[in-house]
């Protein structure tokens, strides 16, 4: 891409920053700094019931203590709902949306093989051609049929990734039955509005990426480069998260936290101050990426493919 690098860290304020989220924050910060780019912070707080009071400010204070300073003031998704409404209107006007009256139980009952990915049940298309007497609950976006349903992209860490949206997922929700905006729509709209060129995040979001690329295509938005770092897991192999009991970072020991997070990314140095550690780690980052890409045969930048359905 010819434009200036712009990256971001986009935490959900469901609790304090922990090691797993720090690994993602650090990776995105290092990638931005190593490329001479800008690094932004966006608070993804549209799922109001899951948000914890003042967790957003706690996250920002912790990032500041760790020396991870954004280049622009943070933004909050809850203050940007007009952008999501306009994107939904645009998709609806183009004929890509339809109302859905199905409950999660009805969807599960209609599937022969129930499959759940990130708490999203595969959708069999029950309401694609009409509500059949049901009341509208949510808004879904159509996915392409046939060969066009396969979306592929080259991830700078994980390598080539492909997903068939039709067979693996189905038409997916953009506005939920409770009136809240779906993550997939909000993140695509915000990344475009903020001019994000490179997305660095955890590998647990790998299978969200084809959905986001599909939405980027439908909305006529640019597709960023993607890099998904391995997630940190606990002693039983579960992703380290607030839900799995991850401990809050100790902001009074920032160097220890950075060293631990760096180790998970393959970044190790012996610097004794936060500023010096981050400066050295920035130089090490591109070497680490080259080593990963050489091992996986991954190209240095990603290219997304996939055609729009008729």
Curated annotation (Swiss-Prot):
Zn(2+) binds at residues 100, 102, 123, 127. Belongs to the class-I aminoacyl-tRNA synthetase family. GluQ subfamily. L-glutamate binds at residues 8-12, 44, 183, 201. A motif ('HIGH' region) lies at residues 11-21. One of its GO terms (biological process) is glutamyl-tRNA aminoacylation. Gene3D superfamilies: HUPs. Its EC number is 6.1.1.-. ATP binds at residue 242. Pfam families: tRNA-synt_1c (PF00749). It is an enzyme of class 6 (ligase). A motif ('KMSKS' region) lies at residues 239-243. The lineage of its organism: Bacteria, Pseudomonadati, Pseudomonadota, Betaproteobacteria, Burkholderiales. GO terms for molecular function: ATP binding; glutamate-tRNA ligase activity; zinc ion binding. Signal peptide: none annotated. It comes from Cupriavidus metallidurans (strain ATCC 43123 / DSM 2839 / NBRC 102507 / CH34) (Ralstonia metallidurans). One of its GO terms (cellular component) is cytosol. It comes from the Bacteria. Its cofactor is Zn(2+). This is Glutamyl-Q tRNA(Asp) synthetase. NCBIfam families: PRK05710.1-2, PRK05710.1-3, PRK05710.1-4, queuosine_YadB.
């Amino acid at each position: 891409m010819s434009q200036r690098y712009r990256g971001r860290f986009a935490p959900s304020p469901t609790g304090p920053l922990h090691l797993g989220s720090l690994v993602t924050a650090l990776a995105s910060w290092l990638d931005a700094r190593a490329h001479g780019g800008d690094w932004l912070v966006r608070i993804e707080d549209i799922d109001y019931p899951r948000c914890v009071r003042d967790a957003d400010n706690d996250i920002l204070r912790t990032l500041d203590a760790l020396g991870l300073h954004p280049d622009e003031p943070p933004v909050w998704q809850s203050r940007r709902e007009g952008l999501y409404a306009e994107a939904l209107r645009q998709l609806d006007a183009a004929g890509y949306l339809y109302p859905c009256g199905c409950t999660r139980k009805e969807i599960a009952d209609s599937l022969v093989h129930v499959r759940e990915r990130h708490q999203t049940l595969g959708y069999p298309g029950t309401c694609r051609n009409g509500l059949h007497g049901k009341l509208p609950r949510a808004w879904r976006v159509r996915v392409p049929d046939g060969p066009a349903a396969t979306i592929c992209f080259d991830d700078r860490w994980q390598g080539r990734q492909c997903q068939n949206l039709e067979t693996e997922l189905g038409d997916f929700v953009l506005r939920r039955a409770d009136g809240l905006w779906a993550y997939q729509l909000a993140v695509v709209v915000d990344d475009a509005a903020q001019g994000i060129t490179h997305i660095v995040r955890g590998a647990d979001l790998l299978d969200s990426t084809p959905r986001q690329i599909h939405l980027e295509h439908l909305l006529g938005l640019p597709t960023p480069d993607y890099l998904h770092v391995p997630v940190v897991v606990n002693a039983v192999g579960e992703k380290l998260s607030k839900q799995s009991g991850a401990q809050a970072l100790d902001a009074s020991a920032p160097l220890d936290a950075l060293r631990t997070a760096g180790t998970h990314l393959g970044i190790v140095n012996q610097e004794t101050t936060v500023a010096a550690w981050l400066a050295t780690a920035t130089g090490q980052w591109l070497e680490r990426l080259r080593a990963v890409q050489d091992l996986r045969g991954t190209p240095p930048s990603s290219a997304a493919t996939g055609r729009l359905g008729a």
